[in-house]
Amino acid sequence: MSHRDSYTMYGTTILCIRQGGSVIIAGDGQVSMGSAIMKTSAKKIKRLAGDSVITGFAGATADAFTLFERLEAKLEKHPGQLMRACVELAKDWRRDKYLRRLEAMMIVADKSVSLIISGGGDVLEPENGIAAIGSGGNFALSAARALCAARDELSLDMTLEYIATAAMAVASEICVYTNNNIIMEKIEE
């Protein structure tokens, strides 16, 4: 499979977990170019809209920063309306010939909603408050779901930070494009 396939993102893992009014997004720090590790401490998580929105990206870095800028403009136009801002961004993404060629995905969250903006310009709200993207996304997603289920069924005291760290550690042990240098941002209720 080609690394230029816009629906398969290589080189990162981004995980979002929501519990009650709190949400956390975690990302690893590895930047890969082909089979070489170029950087181990990249920050793929960013705060927007006066720190009321957190977002993480997978895919081409320059493309992701283009999307960050566009999303920030949409959030300024529609303050406090994350869903609307993301839908407007997705509309632009689908209409604009330049944007359609961007190779990036994003997870975006505020105090009330978490969303995945796909490489095809779709806006998806994940079930169960857990979402993941990137090459290690399915590993982190599976681990986070298992940890949340165990926490709920056994009444265990696990924080969002603990679950995110443990799930990202699982992804970093399986996915060669993901490392264990985890950066997290959280919005508390």
Curated annotation (Swiss-Prot):
Pfam families: Proteasome
Alphabetized InterPro entries for the sequence: ATP-dep_Prtase_HsIV_su, Ntn_hydrolases_N, Proteasome_sua/b, Proteasome_suB-type
Catalytic-site annotation from UniProt: 12
UniProt binding sites for Na(+): 172, 175, 178
Principal EC category: hydrolase
One Gene Ontology MF term: threonine-type endopeptidase activity
Bridged cysteine pairs (disulfide): none
Record-level GO BP terms: proteolysis involved in protein catabolic process
Catalyses which reaction(s): ATP-dependent cleavage of peptide bonds with broad specificity
Keywords for the protein's UniProt record, in alphabetical order: Allosteric enzyme, Cytoplasm, Hydrolase, Metal-binding, Protease, Sodium, Stress response, Threonine protease
Organism superkingdom: Bacteria
EC number: 3.4.25.2
Family that this chain belongs to: Belongs to the peptidase T1B family. HslV subfamily.
Subunit structure: A double ring-shaped homohexamer of HslV is capped on each side by a ring-shaped HslU homohexamer. The assembly of the HslU/HslV complex is dependent on binding of ATP.
Record PANTHER family: ATP-DEPENDENT PROTEASE SUBUNIT HSLV, METALLOPROTEASE TLDD
Protein name: ATP-dependent protease subunit HslV
Organism: Anaplasma marginale (strain St. Maries)
Organism classification: Bacteria, Pseudomonadati, Pseudomonadota, Alphaproteobacteria, Rickettsiales
